[in-house]
């Protein structure tokens, strides 16, 4: 980020992608993935502190189970059903719902929001 920070105008917004796995460790065999996403959440907070005085906001999304091609290809249907059933909203998230949050964070409507890691998981886990 430091390499392109001088090119970013005041009021710019950086949106990182983390994961619910950053907090709960992910599923079996995903220790490295979960650890890397944990680093993203901490990096987001650190960069928010560094870049905030320059007028640049930094936030991250921490999605849970979002219906994507990745899950179509690599997550068993029965696992998806179980996880979706554990959310208070009783379903998987959709990519367009994640995109809506990205649009909000990129807009001036979120001009006082920085250093936040947003859970977008249907209530499966709360911050």
What are these regions (language model features)?
Residues 23, 62-73:
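Short, flexible catalytic-loop segment of classical short-chain dehydrogenase/reductase
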Residues 6, 49-53, 111:
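Alpha-helical segment proximal to the catalytic Tyr-Lys
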Residues 25-34, 46:
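Active-site loop-to-helix junction immediately N-terminal to the catalytic Tyr of the SDR YXXXK motif
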Residues 19:
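Residue(s) in the substrate-gating loop at a strand-loop-helix junction
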Residues 39, 43-47, 51, 61, ...:
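Hydrophobic alpha-helix immediately C-terminal to the catalytic Tyr-X-X-X-Lys motif of short-chain
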Residues 87-98:
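A conserved structural motif in NAD(P)-dependent oxidoreductases
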Residues 103, 114-127:
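Short C-terminal tail/terminal secondary-structure segment
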């Amino acid at each position: 980020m430091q390499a392109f920070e001088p090119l970013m105008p005041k009021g710019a917004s950086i949106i990182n992608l983390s994961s619910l796995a950053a907090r709960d460790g992910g599923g079996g065999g995903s220790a490295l993935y979960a650890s890397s996403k944990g680093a993203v959440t901490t990096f987001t907070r650190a960069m928010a502190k560094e870049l905030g005085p320059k007028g640049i906001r930094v936030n991250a999304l921490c999605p849970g189970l979002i219906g994507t091609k990745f899950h179509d290809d690599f997550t068993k249907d029965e696992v998806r059903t179980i996880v979706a059933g554990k959310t208070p909203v009783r379903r998987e998230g959709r990519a367009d719902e994640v995109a809506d949050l990205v649009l909000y964070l990129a807009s001036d409507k979120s001009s006082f929001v920085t250093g936040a890691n947003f859970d977008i998981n249907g209530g499966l886990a709360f911050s």
